[in-house]
């Protein structure tokens, strides 16, 4: 299961159980009973048709009896379609006696969601008026995002790089390269001769967060200043690093990488920041490019 949300649980828990630093006895929350979603919004990374996601619902007090609550989908605020893009397991939920939480279960239908979609589901709790915490209300939003499993093989072979570096310094809008897995580093590929012959570059795919498929790159030498600029600067090494404040990411569904890089020469200065877009292509397309060019 994969879900991201901005949580209110910390606040609710703080209200439910209070402790004092100077006394041994435990002081418990004895205020009104409220029921609410644990967050205002949730982002679900839908990777198949089988995975169920839990949308937590929290009460501020436990009771000695089961509590039935309802959840409705607000069709006028939703663009996701029930039974086409998602399924709700049940709109009627129970907070068991003595408990504080329950969950609405939602299953995304990946086959009917495209990568470009941002499908929203607006939810509202059906509660008695005295159970509504007006400061937070009864509504929450769920966004369905299409994700794909990470297959490093999809990022090996021929790739086309469209690069502002090659446009400015190599008189080329794009460059054809080959990539392969790094046998010594997990989830890492090697881009052979990325800009200049003999200078390979390693890119690491971060796979822990399917909603944030990021790329990491350590500082690397990617060429000589003589080859890049026609003269020697500093120690003659052209270095490439990842600039702060930029997002470098990949798409497993679409087989591309977007990468920002900063070029510099040690003890001399920064050349600039540039963008690379890697698009993996078939062997047939690569052969056509080698024959005819871009």
PLM features: residue spans?
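Absolute protein N-terminus
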Residues: 1, 22, 245-246
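Bacterial N-terminal signal peptides that target proteins for export
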Residues: 1-9
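Intrinsically disordered, low-complexity peptide-like regions
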Residues: 3, 28, 121-123, 191, ...
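Intrinsically disordered, low-complexity segments enriched in polar/charged small residues
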Residues: 9-10, 205
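Repetitive helical segments and hydrophobic/amphipathic motifs
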Residues: 13-14
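C-terminal motif of bacterial Sec signal peptides marking the signal peptidase cleavage site
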Residues: 17-21
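Acidic/polar, low-complexity intrinsically disordered N-terminal segments immediately downstream
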Residues: 23-103, 107-162, 288-294
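Ser/Thr/Gly/Pro-rich, low-complexity flexible regions
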Residues: 147-294
